[in-house]
């Protein structure tokens, strides 16, 4: 049989030997020695393979399929699966789960035994049963070894000093005080490990463990960048902490989800919003928080959709709330409808005309800084003028200057066209308490100015120059005749539109009675024997032109018309300037157009006209120049 084995074994050819000389022949000698040993042991090769396979099977049966430890005590489940007692007890004691580790079947009770080859279907005598974890123990030894896994024994103490410390905190204090050692409390809390499984470190070892980790793949416990010295078991716990305790920019998260940006609190996040994104500065959105957009286009769309009411009828410029200086206060968008006046009579008592922006109430320190910044801007950073400005404010605060005197001083100091002294008055008022007399005096000046601006913006007042004042009459300028129906109706209709008039009573109806209208006859139908006369009446400032042919007969009017006329007179309306008289200048020479039918025909009148023209030309040329050639008309075309 050995000869047959020798015949079957054929040496394999090494092709590297044909490529040239080899410098090192040691690998070749090793292969030759290996082949000799293999030839000698070929007879006993088959029995050795059988023995090794049996040993491997026994070793696999003695190892836990979960942790690969050698089985000392086993956990048998009703689903006929077997694990070590440590893995089975960890599932029930630390994870609080009763499912099988292999097939995930829920098992209310399992069995812990020292019979490694046993099966759940065999008969066992149970000596102890733990109701809390649902475990049946077949021996006291198994029960003791299993339940001792939960106890806090110190492995560094002597046998007679071993005791249960009851918690990780007391166990760590004992290690630190007695042995100058400690455990990682982060691992003890989150690792789901028994106390005896936790590694014991020195101070430096613990620091390296938490910051650097180890060579087995553990990279250390991550630390929160905002909470000093606070570390977490893994990135999952750190993410939960950052989500609950800190703020994340959702705009940056959308643009780059791989690297989200976190901030300590909302104040830091809002600073990031202001510098990196576009914030809606309307007060309602500032109160709601997180109203921020990626670009300016989205911000404008939000303002038009959510705050369109503050843009209707208002200036088209939007001033940011974040700056403490406003260059043009009249162009700031306000939340309230400052220019929608319900009636003229409500202006003195109303405060809706104030130029209040949407900035929330600021502190006195911010108001002083805003006042100083605006004053320096108006004074072009003149130190001397700013010292005067500060002295005026100090005199007013100490009572040496009244509010009116302060306003006059401001007007003399701030002479630039862009300087708004009333806005400075308003800023100075904000530095005083709201209920103080100094605040009320300054604010009264500011409110009065705002009402005037609002009135001018609503409807500009008419000119009240005495040189342009004229009474309104029917077909008569500058006279004292009774007003016509059209003028009366126009005056009554425009009462509410004039800012200087008093509002009529609600019960008065200018359209209650009808007014009889006298229609004017056409001028060409009036027959007169005498030429029309035009009367002129001169005054100091105006010229009254009243054509007599426009005078209509004075008819009796209704009582309501007289009443309305008296009311118009009592209103003292400003008189309108007189219109310039229309002058029609007639033409000097009336053109004579020839009949087209007579063109080309001889007529005596045409010949006589031609000869007359020639005679005139000869006469004029002969008078001017007695000698020389005379111009003659050779032919005449057209007219």
Curated annotation (Swiss-Prot):
Known pathway: Protein modification; protein ubiquitination
N-acetylserine PTM positions: 2
Key words, A-Z: Acetylation, Cytoplasm, LIM domain, Metal-binding, Phosphoprotein, Transferase, Ubl conjugation pathway, Zinc, Zinc-finger
Catalytic activity, as annotated: S-ubiquitinyl-[E2 ubiquitin-conjugating enzyme]-L-cysteine + [acceptor protein]-L-lysine = [E2 ubiquitin-conjugating enzyme]-L-cysteine + N(6)-ubiquitinyl-[acceptor protein]-L-lysine
GO cellular component, as recorded: cytoplasm; cytosolic ribosome
Gene3D superfamilies: Zinc/RING finger domain, C3HC4 (zinc finger)
Gene Ontology molecular functions: ribosome binding; small ribosomal subunit rRNA binding; stalled ribosome sensor activity; ubiquitin protein ligase activity; ubiquitin-protein transferase regulator activity; zinc ion binding
Residues with the Phosphothreonine modification: 57
Family of the protein in this entry: Belongs to the ZNF598/HEL2 family.
Name under which the protein is recorded: E3 ubiquitin-protein ligase HEL2
Organism, scientific name: Saccharomyces cerevisiae (strain ATCC 204508 / S288c) (Baker's yeast)
């Amino acid at each position: 049989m050995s000869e047959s084995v020798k015949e079957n074994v054929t040496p394999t050819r090494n092709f590297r030997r044909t490529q040239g000389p080899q410098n090192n022949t040691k690998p070749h000698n090793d292969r030759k020695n290996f082949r000799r040993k293999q030839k000698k042991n070929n007879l006993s090769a088959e029995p050795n393979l059988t023995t090794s396979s049996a040993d491997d099977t026994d070793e696999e049966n003695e190892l836990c399929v979960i942790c690969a430890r050698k089985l000392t005590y086993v956990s048998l489940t009703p689903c006929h699966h077997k694990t070590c007692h440590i893995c089975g007890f960890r599932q029930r004691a630390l994870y609080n789960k009763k499912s099988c580790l292999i097939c995930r079947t829920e098992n209310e009770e399992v069995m812990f035994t020292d019979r490694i080859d046993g099966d759940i279907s065999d008969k066992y005598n149970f000596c102890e049963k733990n109701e809390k974890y649902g475990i049946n123990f077949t021996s006291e030894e198994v029960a003791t070894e299993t339940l001792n896994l939960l106890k806090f024994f110190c492995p560094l103490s002597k046998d007679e000093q071993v005791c249960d410390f009851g918690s990780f905190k007391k166990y760590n204090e004992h290690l630190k005080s007695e042995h100058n050692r400690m455990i990682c409390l982060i691992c003890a809390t989150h690792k789901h490990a028994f106390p005896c499984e936790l590694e014991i470190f020195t101070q430096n070892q613990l620091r390296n463990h938490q910051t650097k980790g180890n060579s087995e793949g553990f990279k250390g416990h991550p630390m929160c960048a905002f909470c000093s010295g606070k570390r977490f078991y893994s990135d999952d716990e750190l993410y939960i902490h950052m989500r609950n305790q800190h703020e994340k920019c959702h705009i940056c998260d959308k643009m780059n989800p791989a690297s989200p940006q976190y901030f300590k609190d909302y104040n830091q996040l809002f600073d990031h919003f202001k510098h990196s994104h576009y914030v809606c500065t309307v007060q309602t959105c500032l109160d709601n928080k997180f109203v921020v957009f990626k670009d300016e286009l989205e911000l404008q769309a939000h303002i038009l959709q959510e705050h369109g009411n503050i843009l209707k009828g208002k200036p088209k410029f939007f001033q940011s709330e974040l700056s403490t200086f406003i260059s043009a206060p009249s162009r700031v968008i306000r939340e309230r409808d400052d220019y929608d006046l319900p009636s003229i009579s409500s202006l003195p008592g109303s405060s809706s005309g104030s130029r209040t922006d949407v900035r929330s109430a600021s502190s006195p320190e911010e108001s002083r800084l805003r006042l100083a910044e605006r004053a320096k801007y108006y004074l072009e950073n003149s130190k001397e003028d700013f010292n005067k400005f500060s002295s005026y404010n100090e005199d007013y605060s100490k009572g040496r200057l009244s509010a009116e005197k302060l306003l006059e001083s401001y007007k003399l100091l701030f002479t630039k066209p862009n300087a708004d002294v009333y806005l400075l008055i308003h800023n100075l008022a904000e530095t005083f308490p709201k209920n103080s007399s100094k605040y009320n005096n300054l604010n009264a000046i500011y409110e009065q100015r705002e009402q005037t601006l609002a009135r001018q913006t609503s409807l500009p007042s008419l000119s009240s120059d005495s040189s342009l004042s004229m009474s309104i009459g029917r077909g008569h300028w500058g006279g004292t005749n009774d007003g016509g129906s059209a003028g009366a109706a126009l005056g009554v209709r425009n009462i509410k539109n004039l800012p200087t008039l008093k509002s009529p009573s609600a019960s008065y109806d200018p359209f209650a009675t009808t007014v009889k209208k006298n229609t004017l006859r056409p001028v060409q139908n009036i027959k007169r024997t005498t030429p029309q006369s035009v009367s002129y009446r001169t005054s100091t400032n105006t010229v009254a032109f009243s054509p007599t042919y426009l005078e209509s007969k004075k008819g009796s009017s209704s009582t309501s018309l007289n009443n309305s006329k008296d009311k118009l007179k009592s209103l003292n309306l400003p008189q309108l300037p007189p219109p310039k008289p229309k002058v029609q200048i007639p033409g000097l020479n009336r053109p004579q157009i020839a009949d087209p039918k007579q063109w080309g025909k001889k007529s005596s009148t045409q010949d006589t006209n031609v000869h007359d023209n020639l005679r005139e030309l000869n006469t004029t040329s002969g008078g001017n120049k007695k000698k020389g050639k005379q111009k003659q008309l050779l032919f005449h075309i057209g007219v």
